[in-house]
Amino acid sequence: SIICALCGVGCAGFSKQPIFTEIIGEEAEPVKIVKTARMENNAVQMFFSGTAEFLSAEIFIPETGETQTCSVEPMDIPNDFTDSEGKSGKVDTYTAFALTPTAPIGIGAPFVLRGSVSDTKHSVLDFALPFEGANTRPAKLRITEIRPLYSSKPKSEFIEFIVMESGNLSGITITNVGDKQNPHYQFPAAEVSAGETIVYHWRSVEEGIRDELTAKTISGGTQSCPAARDFWGPYTSIPKRNANVILIKAGVNGDIQDAILYCTEKEFAKRGAAHAWNDE
């Protein structure tokens, strides 16, 4: 019996989630991947339902087409383990491994962990799982200005930051708590220095704009900032305008670096306060 797990092609060559196709016998209960987690040293923890045995594993680097070896070590299952869907079961119903690259992987560099495992019935699961190199030197940002409202193009809502500590932006996350459909923006890999100004533009509404991944990169657009490093959100629609909270975190589940609460003029008026956003 054979089971294949393939990744759909996306803008970076691979989708965020693998697509599984199963071809199994009627009596087979094939092993399945129930959870994965990339660690700070770029090791990937893989959890399987059932008893799994590794047949092969390697790291593929899409940007260069190169492959790297990785070590495979069995892991104990935590007593409080839950899978990616929040389900739990008896510890002895799972198998876990830590797969560690044997060569360094750059901060934010895409890589694919691929390989094969088998179960006790000799069914085979081939997998290809996309990740990005861990940010071991995250920069620290502080919010200095926010413009959550604009009424006319090409003006785009923005958040301005100052870099408090030098490092890399890779994975640093802006969480728009009020937007249930598109709550997160993650910065791409870019080295920044303490004292630099960073501007995140909420929307991409002009031609010629691009992320300023280096200090020498210059973005087009009437709203780009000559004295700052510009980054552009993938959205075209206006962000939520009700009372809202913006969080800056070192990764979706990382530590909070800064936060801000804002309200519309109507919301302020309800509370007996007066404040208006000027469209300037």
Which functions belong to the PLM regions below?
Residues 1-12:
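Sec-dependent bacterial lipoprotein signal peptides
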Residues 14-35, 39, 123-178, 235-242, ...:
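A structural motif detector for short, solvent-exposed N-terminal "entry" segments of globular domains
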Residues 45-49, 160-162:
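Short edge beta-strand/loop segments characteristic of extracellular beta-sandwich folds
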Residues 49-56, 165-169:
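Short proline/glycine-enriched turn/loop motifs at strand-loop junctions of beta-rich domains
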Residues 53-76, 172:
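Short, surface-exposed alpha-helix to beta-strand junction/turn motifs within ectodomains of secreted
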Residues 79-100, 197:
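Aromatic sugar-binding surface patches on proteins
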Residues 101-110:
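Surface-exposed, short loops/turns at beta-strand junctions within beta-sandwich domains
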Residues 106-107, 189, 194-280:
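Solvent-exposed beta-edge/loop recognition patches
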